[in-house]
Amino acid sequence: MSDEHHSGLLYGLEQRIPPLPAFFSALQHVLAGLVGIITPPLIIGATLGLGDWLPYLISMSLLASGIGTFLQSNRVWGIGAGMICMQGTSFAFLGVTVAGGMWVKAQGGGPQDMMAMLFGVNFVAALVPVIVSRFIEPLKKIFTPIITGSVIALIGISLIKVSVINWCGGEKAEDFASMNNIALGAGTLGVIVLLSCAKNRWLRLSSVVVGIAVGCIAAGLSGQFHLHSLGDTLFRLPTLFPLGFQFNSAIFLPVALVSLVCILEAVGDLTANSLISQQSVDDRAFRNRLKGGILADGVSCMVAAMLCAFPNTTFAQNNGVIQMTGVASRYVGRYIGVILILLGLFPPVGELLRQIPAPVLGGATMVMFGCVVAAGIRIITQTPLSRRDVLIVGLAFGAGLGVESVPAFLSHFPPMVGDLFGSAATSGGLVAIALNLILPQEQAATKSLRSQDDRAES
């Protein structure tokens, strides 16, 4: 048997996979990330009064995500991590995007002026990850396992909250947390877990798809799933900068700062992806993957801005799918990219998937997001933790979970602070970086003495 099979992988990173299992695996990645891709444009569009443009924004978000995912998996000219790194619309930019749109509106601008300004600023801000990607070697002392592991674990915990809300029916559901919703999500989750533990590779490969299908059937039989109109537009052809290009430095600065913070999340996602894919996370090949992955993040954001979509980032969800299906083959990323591109070009298909009941998606994503948390913990515990490491991890989790649990903690700070520290991953990650730079390193002799004491006790 191959090393991949001993490690629990059905297909390793560089192992080619037949088309049918590749498609099933890719479809599960798409289902896991679909809601995350289309939700930010829905929120931004509703807040800024862009209702007439929402179908176009959603289609272009899917298209940009597909192009970015394709770039990440192929690693052409050094662009991309060469792994299954699904790109999707970033939630981190919601605050600064809405603030920028409101500023344009206050100056008398309409919806088209707002979007021309926002996408122009986003295009220039995408240069931040492009530039930072060239300096990964000097920054490797910052992106240590305890920092990247803490960030990825906090991302997973934040995603679990989203999963539970969907499981209950969605934030605005009239029957929120009803027994029907709980049972529907639990049934979907149960099917996925059972199939993921099966020895048959086909059952494991299709666990998420089958689980969601069973959940949809159950929802239909119980009257909780009703198909609505799929829209009148069968095909949507994109154009570059359809509304023009505008720029303002006052709007650019906060967007650039959020772009810088998002790099920290991307490093965590890429590290977890490498670990789950049975790749080293402490060699030159890994640093090249980081360099290419962050560069692809920047290029993907540029593509998104040109297409009239909001900034992209590397999604953590797909790490959970890799863990569950055992498929780490980067060639699956091509299929994911093509599926997302088709969803963007053919809106009815994406609309059909969008109508999957929220409890079904909540149950399906629960186990995936839990795997993301586990991947973060695994990164943290790669090496024995010193007292200093425990302090950094503890305070990072405290800061991240504190802000996540009580958002009002930042309510009296300037909006810029709220944008930078508003999520568990960014607040915890920035605290971890600051402590790692400030706290003195433990002396080697102290570490050695402690190791001897541990061995003596054992």
Cite the ranges covered by each PLM segment:
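Membrane-embedded helical hairpins/re-entrant loop segments and their flanking transmembrane helices
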Residues: P19, G45-G80, L257-R330
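Hydrophobic, membrane-embedded alpha-helices of multi-pass small-molecule transporters
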Residues: L20-G33, A177-L189, S207, S222, ...
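Intrinsically disordered, low-complexity non-transmembrane regions of multi-pass membrane transporters
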Residues: M1-F24, S229-L240, L275-G292, I438-S458
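Membrane-embedded alpha-helical modules
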Residues: M102-H228, Y335-L449
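N-terminal signal-anchor module of multipass membrane proteins
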Residues: M1-I84, G95-Q107
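Short, non-helical or kinked segments that cap or interrupt transmembrane helices
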Residues: D52-L57, G78-F93, K141-G149, R204-V209, ...
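Short juxtamembrane and helix-loop transition motifs at transmembrane-helix boundaries
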Residues: R16-F24, I43-L54, Q72-A81, V104-M117, ...
